[in-house]
Every structure is written in C-alpha cells, then in structure tokens.
C-alpha cells in the first residue's frame, strides 16, 4: 500500500517547504499542488545550485516524479510558461511530466490589473498581496463566472465568456480605480497562443491521483503559503484567498481526507511574516536584524524583506489543531546559532493580564503582549549536522521544549538549505 503524505506550512509561509518536499519526493511517484498560485515561492538548493519554483510542484527536480497541478490552484498561463522555459533551459524535462487539471481557474491580465489597483487604492491600509491576481481570480471562481484551463480549448465559448468578464472588470478598472481598460483582442490572442502549449499537459488530475492511489503509489501533496494565511483560519483580512490548511487538500485535489496518511507541518525555528498583519513576537532590534540577515529573509516571489521574530508556540498550537498535524519539521535551526539566549512565546497577555490562546482574526490581536519563556542559546554551529546526537545540548533542549509546548513530535530537523543538510527522526513515508 502506498502512502499519501502532506507537506504544509504552519506559520505565515516561507517555512522552507520546498526543500522538504524535494527531499521527501525521493519516495514519491507524484507530487501535487492543490491551492494557491504563482504567489508561492519554493526555494530548492541541490548541490549548491538554487532553484525557485512558483507554480510547478517542487518534485520536478526529481527524475521520474510526476507533477500535478490540481483544480484548487489558480493558473497564470504566462507565468507557468516562463517557469517551464526556465527549467527546460537548465535541462529539466517538464512537459512530459507536468499535468494540469482542466478545472483549475485561470489568472488573466485583468485579475492582475484589479489586484494592483486595489492595493494602490488602499494606501497605508493595504493587505500586502503579491499583486499577481490571485485574489481576483478566486473571486471569479466563487462567483461562478471565472474561466478555467479547460475553457482554453473551446475558442468561441472562451471568447464569449472573456467578453462578458472584460465588460464587468473593465467597468471597475476605468470608472472606480481610474486605470486603463484591458484590451479584449490582445487578451484573447494571448490566451489562444497559450492554449496550444498547454493542451498536451491537460489531464483529469483527480482521476489520475486515484489511479495512482489504487496502484499503491506514494503521493506527496505540496501546500503553498502557511496556515495563518488561510482565508478562513488565518489572521483575517491579512490572509491569502485560498485554504492553506489541510481542508484545502481535499477540495483542491479531489482526494478525500480518509486517504491522507500523514500531515507534516513545516515550522521555522523562529517566526517570519511578509507584508501587513499582526505579528505578536516581531523583533525591531538587533536580534531581529540578525535573524533576517542570517536567514536570508527576503521573499523568493516578491523580494520583499520578511519581518522576523521569536518562535511562537501559540500560533503553532492552533495550526496543529486545525491541520491535524502528524509531525513537525523544524527548519532553519542553524540561524539561531550564536545567540546567547532564545525566547519562546508561550502565551499572550491582554489588558486584563490574562494569558489567552491565538485569536481567530487580526483585530483581536490588538493590545496583546507575548509571554516569553527564556532558554539558553548555543555557541556551536549546527549547520549541516546530520544526527540529533551531534546537536549542541542547548539546541536539543530547545527542540524538546517546543515539542512539549505544542504537543506534537518534531520528526525532521533542517540544519541548512541543501536537501542533504537534514536530520530525519521519523520518515513520513515509512
């Protein structure tokens, strides 16, 4: 019997999922993306060579692994083709291994224009989107007016729907946001050109996943962003437009929850966040700057500097509950090397002095103060360490304390960016 293993982020994204997916796909026949779009940025380092993927599953760098894009992913044809071309220039065979669900919604030029116009209009109150059209594309999907990958192959039907959509969206762009209209013919011509390239890659991904499952194959489900950016369970409204938590797997791939065997929660050894929104443990001092510098905390999609702070056990407990996490992968432990002391947030204090758990919306974070537990740091380097026993005693104590605070085992520890710089205590596919 094969196993279905999920890899998802437990914080605000950028936890290091790409490396771990790449590591574990050694055992997988297929890797599937089930939500998000090219707002994701998964960085992989193999033998010192860095590759950043935005839409294509991270398993593409493993020879022979099938890569699938499920119906829950919003697909920008231009971004996808750029990514395919870049990989093919490196000698990676993509088209014969990548398959895309015909039910995946399309991101087109008017979605990008709307996304950017809205952020511009919000000014200081902006949400901090990547400006890549993700939100507007999901809006069209939910409103049942969106175009999907499968529509590309029916020119007349596509053109009729596109005309209606542009009438609707251009009205907003021109009259409300005072931005230029999107041209119908140019958009149609571009889409039809992409259709020819995408047609050989279209496949009923849900049916393929169940065929693989029945054949006893191991399958990896690759999440994008992080649990606290979930549209329902995140720090609303400073969230993304998809379900980044485990519930999104079934809706975004068509594989029911009973078929999921193990859910691995990727967790950074400290906390980061990109863009606006609450961040109780954020550091504005030299320590925060040190974490950012050592951890190279700049977004792989936008290049934006990430906000850095201490490890927050409160938000991780919430993520473990919401996702039914089987085990944790702790990443970037080496970034903490050399710190004299390390703080862990164990709770929040409100104006009444009470320690409370993680709120369910952004406004409820206002006025909360983190309650810290201080632990000794370590001077030794953990970079590239391959066994638990080799880690400094203080680092092992830090890991153990996190397990105690969140009630879940740490099964994998990442000690560097390369796939080989990893300690595997319990293998998800075992």
UniProtKB/Swiss-Prot annotation:
Major subcellular location class: cytoplasm
Top-level taxonomy: Bacteria, Pseudomonadati, Pseudomonadota, Gammaproteobacteria, Pseudomonadales
Entries under Pfam families matching the protein: Adenylsucc_synt
Protein name in the entry: Adenylosuccinate synthetase
Disulphide bond pairs: none
Known function: Plays an important role in the de novo pathway of purine nucleotide biosynthesis. Catalyzes the first committed step in the biosynthesis of AMP from IMP.
Domain of life: Bacteria
Keyword NADP among record annotations: no
Cofactor descriptive note: Binds 1 Mg(2+) ion per subunit.
Family note: Belongs to the adenylosuccinate synthetase family.
Name of the top EC class for this enzyme: ligase
Keyword Disulfide bond: no
Binding-site positions, substrate: 300-306
Designated gene of the protein: purA
Binding site for Mg(2+): 14, 41
BP terms from Gene Ontology: 'de novo' AMP biosynthetic process; IMP metabolic process
Localization per Swiss-Prot or TrEMBL: Cytoplasm
Keywords: Cytoplasm, GTP-binding, Ligase, Magnesium, Metal-binding, Nucleotide-binding, Purine biosynthesis
């Amino acid at each position: 019997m094969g196993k279905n293993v999920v890899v998802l982020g437990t914080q605000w994204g950028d936890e290091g999922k790409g490396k771990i997916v790449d590591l574990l796909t050694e055992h997988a026949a297929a890797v599937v993306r089930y939500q998000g779009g090219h707002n994701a940025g998964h960085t992989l380092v193999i033998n010192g060579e860095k590759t950043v993927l935005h839409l294509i599953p991270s398993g593409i760098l493993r020879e022979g692994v099938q890569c699938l894009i499920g119906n829950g992913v919003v697909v920008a044809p231009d971004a996808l083709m750029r990514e395919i071309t870049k990989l093919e220039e490196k000698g990676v065979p993509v088209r014969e291994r990548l398959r895309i669900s015909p039910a995946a919604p399309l991101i087109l030029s008017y979605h990008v224009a709307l996304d950017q116009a809205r952020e511009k209009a919000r000014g200081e109150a902006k949400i901090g989107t990547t400006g890549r059209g993700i939100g507007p594309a999901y809006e069209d999907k939910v409103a049942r007016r969106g175009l999907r990958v499968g529509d590309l192959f029916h020119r007349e039907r596509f053109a009729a729907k596109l005309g209606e959509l542009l009438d609707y969206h251009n009205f907003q762009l021109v009259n409300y946001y005072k931005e230029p209209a999107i041209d119908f013919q140019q958009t149609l011509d571009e889409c039809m050109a992409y259709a020819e390239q995408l047609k050989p890659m279209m496949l009923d991904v849900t049916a393929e996943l169940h065929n693989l499952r029945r054949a006893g194959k191991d399958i990896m489900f690759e999440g994008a962003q992080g649990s606290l950016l979930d549209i329902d369970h995140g720090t609303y409204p400073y969230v993304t437009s998809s379900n980044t938590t485990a519930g999104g797997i079934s809706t975004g791939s068509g594989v029911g929850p009973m078929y999921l065997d193990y859910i691995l929660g990727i967790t950074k050894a400290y906390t980061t966040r990109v863009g606006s929104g609450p961040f109780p443990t954020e550091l504005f001092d030299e320590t925060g700057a040190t974490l950012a510098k050592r951890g190279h905390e700049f977004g792989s999609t936008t290049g934006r500097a990430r906000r850095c702070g201490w490890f927050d056990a409160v938000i991780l407990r919430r993520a473990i509950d919401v996702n039914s996490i089987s085990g944790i992968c702790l990443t970037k432990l080496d970034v903490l090397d050399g710190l004299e002391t390390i703080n862990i947030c164990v709770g929040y204090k409100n104006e009444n002095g009470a320690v409370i758990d993680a709120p369910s919306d952004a406004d409820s974070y206002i006025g909360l103060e983190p309650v810290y537990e201080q632990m000794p740091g370590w001077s030794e380097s953990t970079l590239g360490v391959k066994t638990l026993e080799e880690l400094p005693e203080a680092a092992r104590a830090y890991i153990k304390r996190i397990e105690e605070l969140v009630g879940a085992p740490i099964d994998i520890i990442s000690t560097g960016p390369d796939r080989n710089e990893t300690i595997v205590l319990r293998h998800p596919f075992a």
